[in-house]
Amino acid sequence: MRTRAAALRKRWMVAVVIVLGVFAMLTVYNRLFRERPAPYFESDEEHFLYGSVGTESNEGIPYWIWLVLPRIFPDLLPGPGGYTTLGLLSKDARDLPVGLSTVTIGYPRVAMNCAFCHAGSVRAQPGDLPTIVPGAPAHQVAAQRYNRFLIAAASDPRFTAGNILGEIARNYRLSALDRLLYRFVVIPGTRQRLLRLKEQGGWMDRRPDWGHGRADVFGPIRFQRVGRPIDDAIGSADMMPLWSMAQREPQGLFWNGLHTSIRDAVVTSALSAGASRPWLDADIAKWDRTDAQGMSSLRRVERYITDLKPPPFPFPVDAGLAAAGETVFAAECAQCHSRDGASAAGLSAGVVDTDRHRLSSWTTDASKAYDAFAGRRAWKASGLEPGERYVSVPLDGVWIRAPYLHNGSVPSLKDLLEVPTNRPARFWRGYDVYDPVNVGFLSDGPEARRTGTLHDTRQSGNANVGHDYGTALPAESKRALLEYLKTF
């Protein structure tokens, strides 16, 4: 009898241990790994600004750690102001800046989306609040500096569980279980992930810094996703505008004409930002769904940018002078930049004579490596074969596309109408106060130097040569042409 009772107690104890073990595993899974649906946004614009493009799994940083890093490491930022000193934009008092999304995978994780590089800001005066323009090049954001700040913080001896939990406690009360998980799993894991990012992104250190408003979109794909050997090719280029994409689609959607499909361009951009292959598989499987909450996230991005229009020039325009400029434009510019976009086929680098580094950075070997990486997946992009031309982009919203040329090497349209030897050799990128006379952002002065990064056209990939069109015009014709370009 006693033996039977002892055996029964033993079985009960084993059962209790198993149940407790399963409960513990489910709890840990729920707190560390369980992925919840991404937040839903009613409008496509809000989705573009804050929605997920699948980067949280590979690149996501725990929200509470992300929030407190500028408070622990203010000395690693350009100045006081937290992430705003890197050009990140705040809108409507939201918890996250424009261009960052959050998805809960065990815990809330923060990562980039399309608007990080494609939402610009503009001010008429230094004291004004910024006007945020979705789809505009994010000329004010320092994407490389943002990544380097996160890496520098993780490399710092102050990146400890004690320091981070102490700062989190000043803002939010984690549960006892979450404090344990953060101390022993989440914080050490985040540090290791950021240090791996330092190793994976080492290819950037062999090239000139991007500076504000520029990025090498295909660098992460070449070296971090498809595993090409690191070389010295420089792919840094200006962040592109995303409006009127349907008009641009036939001619090519990147500076060098890669992709003639908006869908492919969106997928490639998400892949560059860190979207995982499983996420892309799942998202593309929903591409044909029409219900808003079940629709593909990237499909919503595509839908938003297909016919997105730029804002009008926000300063006075001399109508008579602009009318005279229209005649100059028809004679000097329309062959490549017709207002309807029909002529935007592109010119070979040898003809336009601009810096060719961006063209050389994507090769046949890289294209083949991408094909092997994507395999037979439904999201595999086409049109990634390297070419020898830069696209003659339509000029809609050209006023807010400064700096100019594919590598952002000319600060204003007035400067672009000068011969290359008379264009500024050094200027400051990233200041968002506008110069309506020269048609571009202010690129020198104390504030431009304080908030921006120096662009030196003597560095490889940064040359301001080429595109000599209009440089021989009389001064009055140039002035009229500038006035007309304000109307695009």
Positions of PLM-derived features:
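Periplasmic c-type cytochrome electron-transfer domains
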Residues: A7-F488
